[in-house]
Amino acid sequence: MGQVYNWQINRKMEYPNEEHHPQSQFAFVFNLNRCIGCQTCTMACKSTWTFSKGQEYMWWNNVETKPYGGYPQHWDVKLLQLLNQVNPNGQKWNGATFEGMTIFEAAKKNIGDASQRVLGYLPTDEEWRAPNIYEDSPVGPEGVKNTFHKDGVTLPEHKTWFFYLARICNHCTYPGCLAACPRNAIYKRPEDGVVLVDQQRCRGYRKCVEACPYKKAMYRPTTRVTEKCIACYPRLEGKDPSGNGQPMETRCMSACIGQIRLQGLVKIKDDGNWAEDRYNPMYYLVKVAKVALPLYPQFGTEPNGYYIPPRWVPRQFLKQMFGPGVDQAIESYMVPDRELLAVLQMFRRSNQIIFRYEIQEGPKVFETQIHGKPFTLYNDTIIAYNKAGGEIFRTQVEEPFYVRPDKHQNSI
């Protein structure tokens, strides 16, 4: 195993493959405070890519209800348990540094399969059968499902809670599926970092299914090969006719009704770190505002999917899922500064990928306090630009308010 630097855990770690990095990296941000669990993203993906025989259980995009839901069932809890068995009580953060074992480091210590390069497991058929299991099931007193606290709650954290977690392949910087494949059938595209399967080389050993910590590599029994999310790469290449040759967001992003999704491409330096691109919305949300956090960064794959954590969920649960930056992310989101509030308006305003934004300052609307902190709202205008530098759209922080005229009072 070689040594690679993983900025999400703030240290070098062991990885079975040689280190290589793409020129740009596909990345996305999901705002979990907005998700309504409508599954429109899920069906947009399903109707585009996985509607054929043998793909019945394939949901490349899924939306599960946390803390009890999961697809496949218990995918995260089972891996967390495996890691704790290998490294009892050692899976801890010290500030921004993860001092426990990643799935690659734990595989070396695991006393099970000596040939295992990545710690993981194969889900059972039963665990794949119910993508919406425990949908809308809240946490009640003492963790009992579907019950409610009779004595009320104290905000901002709720005693009775659940939230929707939308998931696709994270197109990781250090993919577990790629590291585990004995056929070298999995690779990252050099132009955008999308993780793909060469189906001519795949022999269906399912090592990738076992190794992916997020369980987004899926075996198709009719063809006996692995299939997975391809990040709608023809759209990234600008081949969708509706995009006029410009890179477009994926089907699941474009269909999002709750406006929770923003997708982009970030420039990557030779050492694997993100190149500074101050006015790329991805770079701003992840590296500057730091409101968007990776999903289970302690697994060690450096996922390129980022989440704005739900503000009503107990902090310890969120820290286990998104790492030590949760408190700062939620505080920044609840009392956003002028630039962050403007950038948040760009979610789902267009299907084209935003490569750069510009803010034109507008008038002050009002001042108030949020949780004891001063907040000022400005009606700024934010302008989004595509890869060619052309303007995609411009929108304002304060959305227009329309009053229905009397002659249309009863119309729908």
Where in this protein do the model-derived segments appear?
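Non-ligating segments of multi-cofactor redox enzymes
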Residues: M1-I412
